[in-house]
Amino acid sequence: MTPSHPFLVGVTGGIGSGKSTLCRFLEKMGCELFEADKVARQLQVSDPEIMEGIKSLFGKDVYSKTRSGKLSLDRKRIAREVFSHPATLGALNNLIHPKVYNAFRQRALEAFGRGTAILVMEAAILFETGRAADLDFVVVVAADTETRIKRAVTRGLGTPEDIRKRIALQWPQEMLVARADYVVNNDIGKTKLKEEAGRLYSVLVEAAASGPDCQSKRR
């Protein structure tokens, strides 16, 4: 059967795992990259339905205007609330992620038209939304918990306690690993991760050439 889209790859992992760095390497090697979290952030200040939903969850004053007139969203406030109330986090994800996935499917069509062979979606949550089953291949980036906490703190994502709370709300890493088609262990430095990315890229090229009928644990 002739494919109607590029080979679709998901890259996921918990906070501080290094999935973004891995994806940057894959992009430089020739993959096209779709950043789900970046698209979600854009939709939060541009999509009327999502904006109304966010106002319902967090109050109208969660949005404000900057001096230049640009719409601003109080993301720190949202983060405090969702990571203290798991039900609110679930409601926010249900509001945003279907539209993020629609944007990904549209990108896949456009990428196919450009002749893109491999389209990578970087996403903080993938199995959790049920979208992993729609992909041809899923990569999980894993790392030791303390290493992940240090990385997240260094990036300014919160205090160690904040990061621990966020990790506690995410799927356990072992659950992600058990469902992956490929696991990158990232308790290593950037140079080693680049080498791992090179090996992964070779696997993806071979899998893309063989088609989507891989031995996936999700099927």
Curated annotation (Swiss-Prot):
Enzymatic reactions: 3'-dephospho-CoA + ATP = ADP + CoA + H(+)
Binding site for ATP: G16, S17, G18, K19, S20, T21
The protein's name: Dephospho-CoA kinase
Organism: Chlorobium luteolum (strain DSM 273 / BCRC 81028 / 2530) (Pelodictyon luteolum)
DPCK domain sequence ranges: 8-215
GO molecular function: ATP binding; dephospho-CoA kinase activity
Function: Catalyzes the phosphorylation of the 3'-hydroxyl group of dephosphocoenzyme A to form coenzyme A.
Record key words, sorted: ATP-binding, Coenzyme A biosynthesis, Cytoplasm, Kinase, Nucleotide-binding, Transferase
Any Pfam family matching the protein: CoaE
